[in-house]
Amino acid sequence: MWRRVALLSPMISSSSRSLKLSQAASGLKVGESFATDIISQEERVSPPKEKAPFITFVLGGPGSGKGTQCEKIVETFGLQHLSAGDLLRREIAMHTENGAMILNLIKDGKIVPSEVTVKLIQKELESSDNRKFLIDGFPRTEENRVAFERIIRADPDVVLFFDCPEEEMVKRVLNRNQGRIDDNITTMKKRLKIFNALNRPVIDYYKNKGKLYTINAVGTVDDIFQHVLPIFNSFEQLKESSHVNPQSHLGSSLVENSS
């Protein structure tokens, strides 16, 4: 029996040496083969990284026509439309603790903290199956912008600014409201003054980052939209859902990119 073991020992030793040589030839140390198999299996089953959402901010003064253009963008490219104001109103209507706090702030004439608004936006971004978003009328202030970057940890892909002369915006709002002209003019001038004071730093910030597209918002709805289309057609992730000709050309007189 001992002789049989002695005879087998060289064979076992030889097999071991062969295994070592085979693994060495393939760049593996003894014992690494099994671990490598496990790693490769884990790589195969690990889920792919989730794509970052496509985010568009839409800015413009009261009467600039941005709301109408938002509707056409959503319809054409399949983006999900988010409005900070709508989200706040919905939270109030749901009678949540957060909604009660928002309502009390508004009743007291206080500004809703940026963090509250951004977290409502974050909730929509995370719960939606859509990965393309159009955020209307946001950010209104530098504080909004900073809070968005800090909480969401993302930059917008596109920032649209519908630039419209003050006289045209006043005329549009007065025609729309059909109320007392003196009161409306006074209110409009106050709103425009606030918009310019708060929004201008945001607009300048994104202009310096090369993300701002300034649209001349004078003209018919369809004419203006024809100069919005090429901006979105230039992004591959939007072409699949686009219902327009991707060869549309940009009218240089109506749109300006700050990049």
Curated annotation (Swiss-Prot):
Tell me what reaction this enzyme catalyses. CMP + ATP = CDP + ADP; dCMP + ATP = dCDP + ADP; UMP + ATP = UDP + ADP
| Annotated EC | 2.7.4.14
Q: Where in this protein does the record put region NMP?
A: 83-112
Q: Which Pfam families match?
A: ADK (PF00406)
Residues noted as binding ATP in the record, renumbered to the chain: G63, S64, G65, K66, G67, T68, R176, G219
The enzyme class is: transferase
Q: Which UniProt keywords apply?
A: ATP-binding, Cytoplasm, Kinase, Nucleotide-binding, Nucleus, Pyrimidine biosynthesis, Transferase
Q: How does it assemble?
A: Monomer.
What this protein is reported to do is described as: Catalyzes the phosphorylation of pyrimidine nucleoside monophosphates at the expense of ATP. Plays an important role in de novo pyrimidine nucleotide biosynthesis. Has preference for UMP and CMP as phosphate acceptors.
Descriptive protein name: Probable UMP-CMP kinase 2
Which organism's genome codes for this protein?
A: Arabidopsis thaliana (Mouse-ear cress)
The encoding gene: UMK2
